[in-house]
Amino acid sequence: PNDQVVYVVNDNYREPNKPFFAKVNLKGGGDAASAARAVLQTGDFDYAWNLQVEPDILAELLKGGKGEIKTIAGTSVERIELQFSDWKTETDGEKGKLGSVNPIIGDKAVRQALNLACQRDVISEQLYGEGQPPTSNILSGIAAMASPNTAWEFNLEKAGQILDEAGWTLNGSVRSKDGVDASITYVTSINPVRQKTQAINKQSMEKLGFQVELRQVDAAVFFDGSPGNEQNINHFFNDLQMYTN
């Protein structure tokens, strides 16, 4: 219920023979795999967009013979955002108050190390495929907007050196500095591709000495903008959050 919008042509539209379609049924909700299945396997819908579904599952759905997949490298980027504010501490009735400093992510060395711990090529090849290239630019897909001054690399040794030099010492399996453990939360929406991305990144981060708590939130909640919803991307009450934009 309440997950579909139906548009019907206006017979009095100002231009003759337009719009082309007499009726358009736009359906939301559900998950990416179900959307792909509705087009590729059952044929219930004509088009589905932003199918963040594993390549092997899409290949299987294609056997249904109802549709095809068109992949175009666009401007959307799956990214991990870092919370600079102290979201755990309440100041003047507000968590993550502007000007407060996240005791872990607020350290530039930590951010640099986390960046070096992301295997973009593995994530791209294994989980996305179809020519979805890894990138270091948040503005991507438009040559004129792509900075030539940024690059990415996966280098845990270099990341470890940066943390060592910044005073994040390894005590057992977890680093700490000034009495603060390198314990972080990492949230995204419930989606098989994103959960596998989380697992890949967590493994690398933990090798560096971070303690990582993975969190998953239903997409309808994660992307909901309600003021009272503390699990959405707008509140960002986590150290890391991941989604596409």
Language model features with spans:
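Extracytoplasmic/periplasmic ligand-capture domains
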Residues: 1-127, 143-245
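Short, glycine/acidic-rich hinge or "gate" loops at secondary-structure transitions
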Residues: 130-136, 215
